[in-house]
From Swiss-Prot:
Keywords: Aminopeptidase, Cytoplasm, Hydrolase, Manganese, Metal-binding, Protease. This is Probable cytosol aminopeptidase. Its EC number is 3.4.11.1, 3.4.11.10. It is found in: Cytoplasm. InterPro entries: Leucine_aapep/pepB, Macro_dom-like, Peptidase_M17_C, Peptidase_M17_leu_NH2_pept, Peptidase_M17_N. One of its GO terms (biological process) is proteolysis. The keyword Manganese applies. The active site is at residues 275, 349. It holds the Pfam family Peptidase_M17_N. Presumably involved in the processing and regular turnover of intracellular proteins. Catalyzes the removal of unsubstituted N-terminal amino acids from various peptides.
Amino acid sequence: MEINLTTKKLDNVKTDAVFFLMFEDNKKLEGELEKIDKALNGGVSDLIKLQKYKAEEGKFLIVPTLGKIKANYVAIVGLGKEKKFENDILRRVASYIIRKAKELKLSDIIIDTNLQQFENYDEVVQAITEGLILGDYSFDKYFSKKDEHKVKEVQVNIPKNQDKDRLNEFVRIGEILAEAQNFTRDLVNEPANVINTIQFAEIAEKLAKEYGFEIKIYDEEEIEKMGMGAYLAVAKGSDNPPRFIHLTYRPKNSQGEVAIVGKGLMFDSGGLNIKTGDFMRWMKSDKSGACAVFGIFKAIGELKPDITVHGIVAAAENMPSGKAYRPDDILKAKNGVTIEVGNTDAEGRLTLADALSYASELKPDAIIDMATLTGACVVALGEFTAGVMGNNQKFINEILKTSEETGEWMWQLPFNDKLREQIKAPHADVYNVGTTRYGGAITAGLFLEKFVDPKIPWVHIDIAGPSHHTSGWYYHPKGATGIPVRTITWYLLKRSKFFDKIGK
């Protein structure tokens, strides 16, 4: 699908459909839509009255033109109430438009953005671009019969007084971010019989070759030499060996250094504390954090910001066997902290313990980890919101602010000393589970805190809720969402002063 900017008059342009955006507050047709209504002898305004149409978010009014103008259809799509408008609504509405176009078997469409309420067209064209690409996504490679219809071109109509060259740069940024998120979705959606630890490391190697990243991949023997006892314990129950992956993007004019760590469980059965069938379903998505690392690297490989980025993944599988680790086992992490195992299904934090210790030894300016870590976070915040924790409030605030800009919902969960008491172990430095069933998302974050150098600002993002969805929402289809690829990439762009080059 091509996305192009244009400044056309729309009352006599040849296309399959012209989509006009409208706020619910609008009481009359204006501009190009008013001209088209006259050309259709009031066909649009008559249908609005007949259907009692209100431009609620995502609600369509489709008008066949019956050859009276060159466009086959004219459509209105609602933006909802103006006072509730935010840029993410444009992403959502763009995704609805692309799905409607596919439903109607349209090949080329125009989206008109000439609304006086729109002030920042950088944000308008980027949000629409992202929404189109994210909404167009489907994971259909394993279907024997597929819907082959594709929309070939979307033209986004902008006001003539806008700087088209500048806006094309934001279309490009939107394309890169959305394609990186879709790449992440593809990886998460692949089952464990297709992507295991070895194959995941091979994907990292392909990324490194394509974009010129530095890469180190450590095998089981090397992982043991590095003293990663917590990670190895989780991995040893599976016939698929662990692979520790370290990607590095290192530009010439680096403005700082950030390490990104992703939880990389190719599949999580729960181990000896085995999950029930309902809870084991979709556990291919327990690699979502690691896949997000790869998605972020794909984006920065294209955008080339002036900031050094480390991508770190401890890839493993948590399986029951005679070799599997057990409750009551005591493990030693890379940084020397000892861990008493309370439950083998709290394995992600064990792999992250060694990954965060490794990241801390790199002495970056900041560390971000992303993990489908706890069901407790889903209970606390629901399926659509990620939980954010960390050791530096300024850093947490920066991530939360960025998530508001990208439409990837996040909310802070507070650390406190009373919950720290709940991860004290009887016979080791720390328990891998809390001693009560309360505050589980936070106690997991507090566990991770013990493996991060306290001098390094660190944020933990629990994406257990929004990383994967059984029915989909907004521009996310059923399955993997690719969250939080756009948030973390956008944060890296801002931190590296990327937008100074284009005057944002």
